[in-house]
Amino acid sequence: MSYKFPNYLRYADTHEYVKEENGLFKIGVSEFAIDQLGDIVFVELVEKGTNLQKGETFGTIESVKAVEEVYLPFSGEVISVNEGVIDNPEILQNDPIGDGWLLIIKSESNVLLDELMNSDEYKSKVVPN
């Protein structure tokens, strides 16, 4: 499979992506990681208004192969949860970078996107040369 690694995303070691939008941060899971999971059957996410610390679990993604936790790459408050992926996990599987985002976070701390991998760094980590 050919994966997309858009330049506008930053990636955590645990395969979550971050997209900055108007001072807020959209969080999701990379195409590569979703593909590795296989058929997704269930998604559970924290509630809107939840305050999370860097590295804290914000949900689980269950597939026919495994159950994986997802982690927040920085501290912040959940201001939006994508209910669509909870109601229909296929959205996450079919479009993880688009309609399959998971949370929108407001962060009061200085979010250092430079601490996360850029698309080339992430691609070299997950796709053999």
From Swiss-Prot:
The modification N6-lipoyllysine is found at K65. It comes from the Bacteria. InterPro entries: 2-oxoA_DH_lipoyl-BS (IPR003016), Biotin_lipoyl (IPR000089), GCV_H (IPR002930), GCV_H/Fam206 (IPR033753), GCV_H_sub (IPR017453), Single_hybrid_motif (IPR011053). Keywords: Lipoyl. The keyword DNA-binding does not apply. Its cofactor is (R)-lipoate. One of its GO terms (cellular component) is glycine cleavage complex. The glycine cleavage system is composed of four proteins: P, T, L and H. Belongs to the GcvH family. PANTHER family: GLYCINE CLEAVAGE SYSTEM H PROTEIN (PTHR11715), GLYCINE CLEAVAGE SYSTEM H PROTEIN-RELATED (PTHR11715:SF3). This is Glycine cleavage system H protein.
